[in-house]
């Protein structure tokens, strides 16, 4: 919410979120609920994927690498998939772009990063 407010961007202007997506039951539902609290219960045009599904958790480098992937998504107008997503947990019902990358027209993309000990950060990128 703060990233959007600071940028002067409305939630409905964001087309893609590169989620932290650690594939843990508690973490995935918490992130899904946070996304829904800002973007609505079932945001129709919002794609959410986790680049972490393809590379694992890079610990201290995760936020930087995921930001680069988010920027490349805007440049290439292609959303990377969440691989190996066959049966999302109950309540995890967003468009997680399963298995296959998707072409998409995007102007804004958000990257979520959560750290050990409760540090959270989200950064909003705009296509230029």
Q: Which role fits each region the language model picked out?
A:
Residues 1-128:
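Conserved "HGTGT" condensation-loop signature of ketosynthase/thiolase-family condensing enzymes
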